[in-house]
Amino acid sequence: MKVLTKYLFVLLLIAGMSACSKTYFDINENNPNNPNNVDIDLVLSPQLRNIAYIQHMGSDDMSYWMGYWTIGGGSFVNSYVFNYTFDNKWFQGMWTSYYNYLGNLQYIDQHANGNNFYRGIVKTMNVVCYHNLIDLFGNIPYTQALQIDKYPTPAYDDAATIYNNLYQQLDSARDLIKNWSGNVPKGDIMYNGNKGNWVKFINTLQLRLILRVSQLTTKPPYYATALKNLLNSAASDGYISSVETEGNVNPGFFNQTGKGNPLVERFWNISQNQQTSSYNYYRANAAAVNFYWDGFNGYGDWRLYRMYAPYDNNSNHFKGAYFGVPTANNDTLSGLSWGDNVNGTFSGTNGFGIIKNVNQPIPMMTSFESYFLQAEAAYSNIIPGDYKALYKNGVRANFTYLYKGSLPDPSGNIAYQPNDAIADANGYMTQTSGKVNNFNIELTTDPLQTILSQKWISMNGVNPFEPYADFRRTGWPTYIYGSKYPGAPALPKRVFYPSIEYATNTANVKAQGEDVLTKKIFWGR
């Protein structure tokens, strides 16, 4: 841990770091300046950007495991990727990145000069970082973390105990922001100092964490108080419920190499005006493609055309491969649907799907996630509300998200349906044929399955962390297969502690017991 935290407070040039699970981010490569001279707004902006992106696209593995993507034919892949025999360095970048962000957030808190709006944002982002670390690894350093001089080898805290404190941190963050009447943070590139939207974000985040433990017989001690406070705040302040209240982060992306949205630049080379090699590396996963196709038994799930592209100019030619099943080539595998049309042209301004334009924001938390969280909580009698109406709003919001941006008539033989997201969503949800448990909340025999299935497909290309947690705590959706590589074990319930901890914090990491992928997180099944 000492190596992790040595320069925590001065990592100001990490905005471009993708935190891919396959890359070790070595913080010792940075040449830090004196942190005492740094404007906290210049620290806040990159933290919001990086925390949003690592959750959005920081792990290819979770997108594979959740049935969204697979690896294209012709790409060299070691078998350990498919059968989960990777080593302790595989998720090391995730660990080091989150602790780096936490250290920078602590710097903001220490230099806020009494501005409680900054402090409320810091507490909120701390919760995002810590809960994602727990959801991946289990027990982690918490109370002694970020105190390198006092605790060079910090002890690990019990994950459930940390969650209990995270609820309290969110209560505190909400109060700090609601009661603040002074200057707003200039570095707030998510809500531009809108207190009401920050409170909605906090409420939605707290509901996410409430649902994590909702099926446990014994809840964390502060759970009841947190839920009471959440219900009181939600009654007056609400949850994320629209594009305007979504947690979207944008530092000012524009059409220049290194300055565009990082997801877009992953697939589109701005300076060369062409696709990158990543476009052919990532292919559609059969689990998601087949789910979208189920809708075509009736009205049709036209999100398929916004998420994936036909592999040729026949509009019915969609195909995915299961992760772990080797493919010889990409000729009959769909890639991502992106740009201005399926033939690969991309102006950088008028796209659809998840790759719309170079200046699109990074989603931290979307309205459709919020609606599905509320729908599950209402169905489970945790919060008041009409779970059917909330579910329908979630589906509509996801259709709108994927349709947003222009959808011109493409060249070739591909014909798209009318660009009316709400009408298509409503038609999709009123189908009476096909696997109605997947989409019709009025006819389903298992509303929870329907809610979680739509939440899963809606998070495709948006946030694989959340469905990975849902699957481990509920077992839904059942058609998530992880890897179909011959002999591959069950989907990991957690990931290994990083090798850097074994090198620098040996006794404390070993005190956590056997470091295996089959050990469930405290809220897991």
Where are these regions (language model features)?
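Gram-positive Sec-dependent secretion signals
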Residues: 2-5, 375, 451
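Short, compositionally biased low-complexity segments
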Residues: 20-27, 73-81, 137-144, 412-430
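Membrane-proximal, proline-rich intrinsically disordered regions
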Residues: 20-68, 89, 96, 107, ...
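C-terminal functional modules
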Residues: 398-525
